Amino acid sequence: MAKDTFYITTPIYYPSGNLHIGHAYSTVAGDVIARYKRMQGYDVRYLTGTDEHGQKIQEKAQKAGKTELEYLDEMISGIKNLWSKLEISNDDFIRTTEERHKQVVEKVFERLLKQGDIYLGEYEGWYSVPDETYYTESQLVDPVYENGKIVGGKSPDSGHEVELVKEESYFFNINKYTDRLLEFYDENPDFIQPPSRKNEMINNFIKPGLEDLAVSRTSFDWGVRVPSNPKHVVYVWIDALVNYISSLGYLSDDETLFNKYWPADIHLMAKEIVRFHSIIWPILLMALDLPLPKKVFAHGWILMKDGKMSKSKGNVVDPNVLIDRYGLDATRYYLMRELPFGSDGVFTPEAFVERTNYDLANDLGNLVNRTISMINKYFHGELPAYQGPKHELDEKMEAMALETVKSFNDNMESLQFSVALSTVWKFISRTNKYIDETQPWVLAKDENQREMLGNVMAHLVENIRFATILLQPFLTHAPREIFKQLNINNPDLHQLDSLQQYGMLSEAITVTEKPTPIFPRLDTEAEIAYIKESMQPPKSIKQSDEPGKEQIDIKDFDKVEIKAATIIDAENVKKSEKLLKIKVELDNEQRQIVSGIAKFYRPEDIIGKKVAVVTNLKPAKLMGQKSEGMILSAEKDGVLTLISLPSAIPNGAVIK
């Protein structure tokens, strides 16, 4: 039996500069939906890509001394690398410079021209190059007047200066579809989400009257040329929007994917381009006599405390920085938990670090670590299949687990990601409280309570399994690691439909002997400072007055052996304000290292960190403690910061 299909798209991004956290927000949200729908059993197709034509790209390439494609290939490589880091599960990546797209754009344009929806005329209007958008005088922000006449102004979308442009252009007669579009809105009240966006489209754009749309340009030549009039380049409204069907093979020799997946179930985008997707795109599809997408969802902006992100303000957040230092799960979790989907949200370094420490490290990570440690301590790591008595709290706990699943599913269907995650964390917090209420350490002292102790452990493991499955659309590394450490290897027990009833984990399990923290705690002050520093624009390089150290030969450097290791224990050295005694794990070996970082880190804050260790130093004694290596750190103005490595690097890996 064929699966139901689900087709989801992000906007295609304009690669005129490096992507920021806002672009990652849209794409992670799409990925969360795609993963969730796959868990529900849908045949999902998830599309993202890049909008690569236009005047701004041409100017950027010329400034860089490259051809347009040379410039674009470099930019797209960075974008694809970012999506790979975030483990975005897209099924296709469309580039508007691809031949498969170009051919569809040409056919669509000529069809609309032939049937009279497009006509040739002359356009004069206010144009913003960065936005690739024309505006009427009434739409301009901060208009500039001379002798009572508008002579300039700014884009209402981005605030960039506009210029008066006059050129021959093809126009798309969208006004004739106004009544049909409004009728579609009435028949499909959930088409535009959130509802406030629908009111904005009707009141601000449709009711004042839709003006015919300029859909070609002659002032630049980087784009798809109109086949019947090659001096014209097809403008963004048709070129970019058509990607949603060109990627499926519409009007190609093979329309299998188009027939299977169209119409789209949801188009995701930021709110500044909802007008194009909720007015122009539906009208274009009507003109082509194609079904319309089922939903257009416009999420809000990620703002900073001082407004929108801007390089000049030094408040642009590079998602690569967050992923490289804190991991993809912490980054994905923050975006989906802290920012209510559909509304604007504010990014702060403080909130990012707090979410990572309190939600991920303390609540989730500590629950997993405590549970595995207790199973090792009380059952030698082997928890038998439970068949004993229940604790008086268990019925409420089991009922809450099932209610959490229902609430989670309801919120996921309405794209309330933050609320869905909140319900999971209430369940995680309640499970942590369950440990305190059942007091396994007391039960373990009474041999007559052995079966009850096994029951408590079984409920903890089952609760963790429930939470882990629900987190799979959001987190990618942590669920795999949790199932690995719990040794729950049956793939059926990783599935969403296994949560229809409580207690599916009926088999005995053998947990890992040495649980590794899933999310190491962060040093709050140090990491907030690090994120803030990373947001600043690059400083001009000045020559240092301090002489560098004597140069060494590569053979000298080659003598130093540096390996990746995980800190598994740490404590203060008695009678020392500077030293910490640290135990690290290197592949199959553990070592003790004494490090002078006590003034900058508390012992509990560094457990679980992946660090770089010099492993071939001669052993030394510091304050009576043996030290078998050196943990590398960076020093600036007397402040030491541990050099953290990505968690994906295995212990013992040689750093070169």
UniProtKB/Swiss-Prot annotation:
PROSITE patterns: AA_TRNA_LIGASE_I, TRBD. GO terms for biological process: methionyl-tRNA aminoacylation. InterPro entries: aa-tRNA-synth_I_CS, Anticodon_Met, M/V/L/I-tRNA-synth_anticd-bd, Met-tRNA-synth_bsu_C, Met-tRNA_synth, Met-tRNA_synth_2, Methionyl/Leucyl_tRNA_Synth, MetRS_core. Signal peptide: none annotated. Residues 556-656 form the tRNA-binding domain. Keywords: Aminoacyl-tRNA synthetase, ATP-binding, Cytoplasm, Ligase, Nucleotide-binding, Protein biosynthesis, RNA-binding, tRNA-binding. Pfam families: Anticodon_1, tRNA-synt_1g, tRNA_bind. It is found in: Cytoplasm. GO terms for molecular function: ATP binding; methionine-tRNA ligase activity; tRNA binding. One of its GO terms (cellular component) is cytoplasm. It catalyses: tRNA(Met) + L-methionine + ATP = L-methionyl-tRNA(Met) + AMP + diphosphate. Its EC number is 6.1.1.10. It comes from the Bacteria. Its main location: cytoplasm. ATP binds at K311. A motif ('HIGH' region) lies at residues 13-23. A motif ('KMSKS' region) lies at residues 308-312. HAMAP family: Met_tRNA_synth_type2. Homodimer. Belongs to the class-I aminoacyl-tRNA synthetase family. MetG type 2B subfamily. Is required not only for elongation of protein synthesis but also for the initiation of all mRNA translation through initiator tRNA(fMet) aminoacylation. This is Methionine--tRNA ligase.
